[in-house]
Amino acid sequence: MNHSDIPAVALLLSSIQNTFRWKLDYGPWQTEIGGQMIFTDNHSKAGTGIVPVIPNYTEMQAGAYGIQKYRYERTAVEAGIRLDRQETRAGGYDWTGNYYGGNRKFCNFTYGLGGHYRLSKYWELTSNFALTWRAPHVHELYSNGNELGSGMFVRGDASMNAERSHKWITSVSYRDKVFHIRLDSYLQWIKGYIYDEPLKENITVISGTYPVFRYRQTPAFFGGADFDFRFMPAASWEYHLIASFIRANEQGTGNYLPYIPSFHLSHELAWTHQTKSHILFRLTARHKFVAKQNRFNPATDLIPYTPPAYHLFGAEASMECPVKH
């Protein structure tokens, strides 16, 4: 019997979003207040023959905020506060036929302080410190089944709390006709960082055997930087380089956290030429380097090693020709 026309997953998602924003400018000051309300209804459609990995759920989010800004000559500062509330109602039957789900409510107050200063004609400095939060997703709370896209059997934790973090970001940039340079660095302390961890066990269901992962929370520290460099020596030539790295550890133990990207570097050299008839030619050579992740704990991942470092090389040639109508 052919069931190839029946999808493995069929979800009906309905969402209503409302946003309100009001601004007032007076001299060097600007005041902004606003609010947002989002209602989401997610239900799986019957008849697929496969139990969905998450239960049906509805979610109501509401928030209100206020921002005060001040600008004077080279300086700009701002401060903001926000209050959010989220309620999630979930219910369904798992692959064993047992009912599961629940009702969770989250409420949080956050704030942010930031400043921007133009050091000179070409240099700028920006810094921001904020308290942020993220409520756990239904997938992290109530997952209990096989993820069709990843081949993992995932279990949520309905007792998890919201993530709360303090984040400090500082940026320095330089910009003129030839160079565009920007360095962003950040530090982040997270209370209740959420991630999925392998339990080092397998489970067998009708469709096969899968490794079991479970969502958990831990205090974590993140630090990293992003570097963006552009060099335009002539109208036809441009060199662009992007590099990024991140460090992440579990607070208290210092253990490495899983799924953290290793050092990345990508750059390209492009040549463009436009003829008098407006035909545009472009040649590009690219290179990307991804380092091996050595900050790795085999106990918190599915396999006891990380992939080796690798290089990717590419080239592209294109032509754009305008067509008269």
Where are these regions (language model features)?
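Extracellular loop and loop/strand-boundary signature of outer-membrane beta-barrel proteins
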Residues: 2-10, 17, 47-56, 93-102, ...
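Residues on the lipid-exposed face of transmembrane beta-strands in outer-membrane beta-barrel proteins
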Residues: 18-26, 64-70, 113-117, 160, ...
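Short coil turns and loop connectors of transmembrane beta-barrels in diderm outer membranes
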Residues: 27-28, 73-74, 121-122, 166, ...
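Face-selective signature of the C-terminal outer-membrane beta-barrel domain
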Residues: 1-118, 123-124, 130, 174-175, ...
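Residues that define the transmembrane beta-barrel architecture of outer-membrane proteins
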Residues: 12-16, 58-62, 105-109, 164-168, ...
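Gram-negative outer-membrane beta-barrel transporters
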Residues: 186-190, 207-293
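Outer membrane beta-barrel strand-and-loop segments of large Gram-negative receptors
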Residues: 9-21, 63, 155-161, 167, ...
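Surface-exposed extracellular loop regions of Gram-negative outer-membrane beta-barrel proteins
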Residues: 41-44, 55, 85-96, 103, ...
